């Protein structure tokens, strides 16, 4: 079956040149008369004094430039340190440095490793505005992305008082990895998000790596009943675990004055996932440590005791283990519940780069035991699905997962400028059995259905060699959903193509001879930003009589979900 659409970006790769050529100047109309006093000191060092009455200092960025280190100094004290790829020959975009909160203070910046001849000195400006309105034509519409800057792992996802909080790894000073903060957004429905100020910023212990949040309903930590408590990795030359807490439903956080709360001699020691274990009446922390997960317990979120380790001889080990999660789920069609340990690995994914594996088993408050040590189970068979974790305290005990929709092989090279990276759609997790094994299924959360407009039905037809549906939609803006239900009448291979008038296509096919489903994006558009992006990925499927495909298309991505009358499987290319 061939299916055509006027506009489809099969990868984050097609329209950036056009977008940049037609972009509106983000500084148009901004007041720039306020003073910036620049003193060059030689050997790449400069002192810049700015007018504290302005809200922002707008820094020009050129992504091909090396990083310069900036020290923000207020009344002779360093209050912020960060790196920026300052424009040397051209300006790719601007990033804001927030000066609010320092009115009537003396503000200066110590710039290091920035040449005196660089263009940045001429282009930096003071302003009371920063235009973060979208200038990227192919920014996803219903996958979350930052207003500007770099994003990777989802962090600290927690639900409280009708609000879903999404924190995430964030660089507000550029669209490449670095300067890790916790960004923040809030939603009431998992679909529509409101950007919030940075939640947690770097400090003397280091930048802010991944972690989790809990609602301390019974005030076990003593910060206050109902406090949102955040756990994160403070990263510098070494990695240690720290905590912060919020008493205003996540709007602001105060760092614990006795950080760090957990240390180690291990170099890779990060990404704490914390949850309450009712049976043992303790908090549990799962930490990624090299190529294993370590489990700790605590009565009060402050004092932690080592319990056990998991990982040796289990699953894939071609890369570092990261971003753990440990959740309990009922098994569909039974009265059983089992525990799932989610483990993200980089590199070592089935198709190169980063990916998410998981283990099913038991957990007694001290030790996790994998019920199938000989098997490696993958949560998603697309190449752009990593750092998967679930919301804490979700209503009705739902286990709602979110992933970073990218891959470390090429994440920094994806050709967007205003921002980089998006998340997967939220997915509800469940367990099911197949051939004596227990597997994890993930289905787009039912809130996604609210996005549907009026359906355009194409009716029932038989396919003899090929059948073309043209156009597949009479009108759309690059965001749509396709549902295909079909029966096989004896074919060994069934293929589908989604293509446009430019000859760009994504090909999908079932191979009933070896029970695999393949999605091929090698001809999906401009893929030359990375040698490893243009790939075909395959997933095992269950033989069945009837099949359902669900395609979620959102400007820069395709997520494919597969179900049949035999089992629930998931193939995602987000």
Indicate where each model-derived feature is located.
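Secretory/extracellular carbohydrate-interaction modules
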Residues: 465-521
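Bacterial N-terminal signal peptides
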Residues: 13-23
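Conserved small/polar residues in nucleotide/adenosyl-binding loops
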Residues: 562-569
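Beta-rich carbohydrate-recognition and catalytic domains
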Residues: 32-272, 276-322, 330-381, 396, ...
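Bacterial N-terminal signal peptides that target proteins for export
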Residues: 2-13
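Bacterial Sec-dependent signal peptides at the C-terminal "C-region" and cleavage site
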Residues: 23-33
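Glycine-aromatic-enriched beta-strand/loop faces of beta-sandwich-type recognition domains
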Residues: 256-259, 502-546
């Amino acid at each position: 079956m061939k299916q055509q659409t006027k506009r489809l970006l099969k990868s984050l790769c097609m329209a950036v040149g056009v977008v940049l050529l037609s972009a509106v100047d983000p500084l148009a109309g901004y007041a720039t008369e306020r003073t910036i006093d620049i003193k060059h000191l030689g050997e790449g060092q400069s002192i810049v004094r700015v007018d504290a009455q302005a809200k922002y200092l707008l820094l020009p960025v050129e992504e091909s430039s090396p990083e310069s280190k900036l020290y923000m100094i207020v009344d002779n004290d360093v209050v912020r340190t960060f790196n920026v790829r300052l424009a040397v020959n051209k300006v790719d975009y601007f990033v804001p440095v927030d000066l609010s909160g320092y009115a009537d203070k003396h503000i200066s910046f110590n710039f290091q490793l920035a040449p005196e001849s660089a263009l940045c000195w001429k282009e930096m400006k003071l302003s009371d505005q920063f235009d973060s309105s979208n200038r990227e034509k192919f920014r996803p519409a219903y996958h979350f992305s930052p207003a500007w800057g770099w994003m990777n792992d989802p962090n600290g996802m927690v639900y409280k008082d009708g609000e879903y909080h999404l924190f995430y790894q964030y660089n507000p000073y550029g669209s490449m990895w670095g300067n890790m903060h916790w960004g923040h957004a809030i939603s009431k429905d998992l679909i529509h998000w409101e950007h919030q100020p940075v939640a947690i910023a770097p400090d003397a212990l280091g930048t802010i790596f991944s972690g989790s949040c809990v609602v301390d309903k019974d005030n076990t930590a003593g910060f206050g009943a109902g406090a949102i408590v955040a756990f994160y990795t403070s990263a510098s030359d070494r990695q240690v675990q720290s905590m912060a807490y919020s008493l205003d439903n996540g709007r602001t956080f105060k760092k614990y004055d006795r950080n760090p709360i957990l240390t180690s001699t291990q170099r890779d020691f990060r990404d704490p996932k914390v949850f309450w274990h009712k049976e043992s009446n303790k908090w549990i922390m799962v930490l990624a440590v090299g190529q294993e997960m370590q489990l700790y317990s605590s009565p009060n979120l402050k004092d932690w005791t080592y319990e056990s380790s998991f990982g040796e001889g289990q699953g894939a080990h071609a890369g570092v283990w990261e971003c753990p999660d440990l959740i309990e789920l009922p098994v569909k069609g039974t009265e059983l519940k089992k525990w799932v340990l989610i483990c993200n690995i980089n590199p070592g994914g089935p198709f190169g780069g980063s990916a998410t594996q998981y283990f099913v088993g038991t957990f007694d408050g001290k030790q996790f035991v994998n019920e199938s040590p000989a098997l490696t189970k993958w949560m998603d068979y697309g190449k752009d699905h990593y750092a998967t974790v679930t919301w804490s305290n979700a209503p009705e005990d739902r286990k709602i997962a979110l992933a970073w929709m990218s891959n470390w092989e090429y994440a920094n090279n994806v050709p967007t400028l205003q921002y980089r990276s998006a998340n997967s759609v939220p997915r509800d997790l469940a367990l099911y059995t197949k051939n004596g094994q227990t597997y994890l299924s993930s289905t787009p959360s039912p809130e996604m259905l609210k996005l549907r407009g009026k359906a355009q039905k194409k009716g029932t037809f038989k396919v003899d060699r090929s059948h073309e549906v043209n156009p597949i939609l009479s009108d759309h803006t690059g965001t749509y959903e396709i549902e295909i239900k079909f029966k096989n009448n004896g074919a060994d291979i069934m293929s589908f193509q989604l293509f446009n008038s430019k000859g760009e296509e994504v090909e999908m096919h079932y191979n009933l001879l070896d029970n695999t489903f393949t999605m091929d994006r090698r001809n999906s558009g401009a893929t030359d930003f990375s040698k490893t992006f243009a790939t075909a990925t395959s997933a095992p499927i269950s033989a069945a009589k009837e099949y359902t495909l669900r395609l979620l298309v959102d400007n820069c991505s395709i997520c494919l979900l597969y179900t049949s009358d035999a089992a629930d499987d998931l193939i995602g290319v987000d």
